[in-house]
């Protein structure tokens, strides 16, 4: 699934992790110095309300740093192991990551907007308020600007992700078709090439971006939780710890991920077995269309019993997983 689209090297994913770690370390260790070299001021940490949130010196430096880091990583693999899908796999993945990060920052911008807006609404309802309608309308316009960016970004991201995933499916299709002589003996080989690549593409389109967005959301709001932790000194049951909201969010995310992984450990195997029993049942029906000796009631009943048993197992395991 992956070697057909991404560089076919055992070192690729290790290089992704290593380069990401190096890039993150350099950014958090030297971003102030890098900004000073470019004449950018990163000292202002006050949240900017409205679309200006995306055009601060800090964001400008990040955009430039991310683009250079991605370009250097891609340049290495273009030289090391060039292939047809390299541009789509690396630059496409990088663009999706950036778009997802930007969409999370839209949520941060809206979160920053809520405080002054609702403070203004609350003050407007008190006696002797100095809040004017112009101020309220100005805040509403700022929200509309951010919301417009969010809508446009969502539409463009989904459009690009659809094309990205179909290119991935094309790469998988070409890979398996080139090995058709070897895989044709596998039960339901035609379905594996056609349906499994389609299902994989659909799953990645629906869940892949959601997973990345969930991780990005966590990291985007960690600085907010760090600041809010100044006003919280302890957690229930646990007691006093430094920056409790910050560490509690990380611990809960890890705990929830591990819990779901353990609880759902049997589901992939059952889904795979489900494909096999469904394929066996369908294959017998197909044979019965051209051969009267096949697809007899007794045989079909036995095959469908296997389908039923596997589905009932799936229902049971999904019950406690859900």
Residue ranges with predicted function:
Residues 107, 150-154, 158, 199-224, ...:
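Membrane-embedded alpha-helical bundles that form the substrate/pore pathway
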Residues 10-19, 55-106, 126-166, 237-262, ...:
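Transmembrane-helix motif of ABC transporter permease domains
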Residues 32, 107-119, 154, 158, ...:
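Short helix-terminus and kink motifs of transmembrane alpha helices
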Residues 22-39, 74-79, 103-123, 127, ...:
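Juxtamembrane "helix exit" motif at the C-terminal ends of alpha-helical transmembrane segments
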Residues 199, 276, 280-283, 287-322:
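An intracellular "coupling" helix at the cytosolic face of ABC transporter transmembrane type-1 domains
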């Amino acid at each position: 699934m992956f070697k057909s689209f991404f560089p076919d090297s055992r070192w690729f994913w290790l290089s992704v992790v290593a380069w990401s770690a190096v890039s993150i370390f350099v950014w958090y260790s030297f971003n102030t110095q890098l900004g000073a070299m470019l004449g950018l001021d990163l000292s202002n940490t006050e949240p900017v309300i409205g679309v200006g949130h995306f055009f601060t010196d800090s964001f400008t430096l990040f955009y430039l740093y991310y683009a250079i880091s991605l370009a250097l990583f891609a340049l290495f693999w273009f030289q090391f192991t060039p292939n047809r899908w390299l541009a789509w796999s690396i630059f496409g993945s990088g663009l999706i990551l950036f778009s997802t990060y930007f969409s999370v920052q839209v949520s941060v911008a809206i979160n920053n907007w809520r405080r002054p807006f609702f403070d203004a609404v609350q003050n407007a309802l008190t006696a002797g308020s100095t809040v004017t309608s112009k101020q309220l309308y100005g805040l509403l316009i700022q929200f509309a600007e951010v919301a417009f960016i969010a809508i446009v970004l969502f539409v463009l991201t989904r459009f690009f992700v659809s094309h990205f995933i179909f290119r991935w499916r094309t790469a998988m299709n070409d890979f398996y078709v080139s090995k058709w002589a070897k895989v044709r003996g596998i039960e339901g080989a035609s379905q594996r090439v056609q349906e499994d690549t389609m299902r994989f593409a659909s799953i990645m389109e629906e869940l892949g971006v959601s997973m990345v967005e969930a991780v990005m959301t966590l990291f985007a709001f960690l600085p907010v939780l760090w600041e809010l932790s100044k006003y919280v000194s302890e957690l229930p049951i646990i007691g006093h710890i430094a920056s409790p909201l910050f560490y509690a969010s990380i611990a809960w995310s890890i705990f929830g991920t591990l819990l779901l992984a353990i609880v759902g450990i049997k589901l992939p195997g059952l889904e795979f077995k489900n494909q096999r029993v469904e394929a066996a049942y369908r294959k017998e029906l197909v044979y019965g269309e051209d051969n009267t000796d096949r697809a007899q009631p007794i045989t079909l009943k036995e095959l469908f019993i296997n389908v039923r048993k596997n589905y009932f197992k799936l229902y049971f395991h999904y019950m406690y997983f859900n």
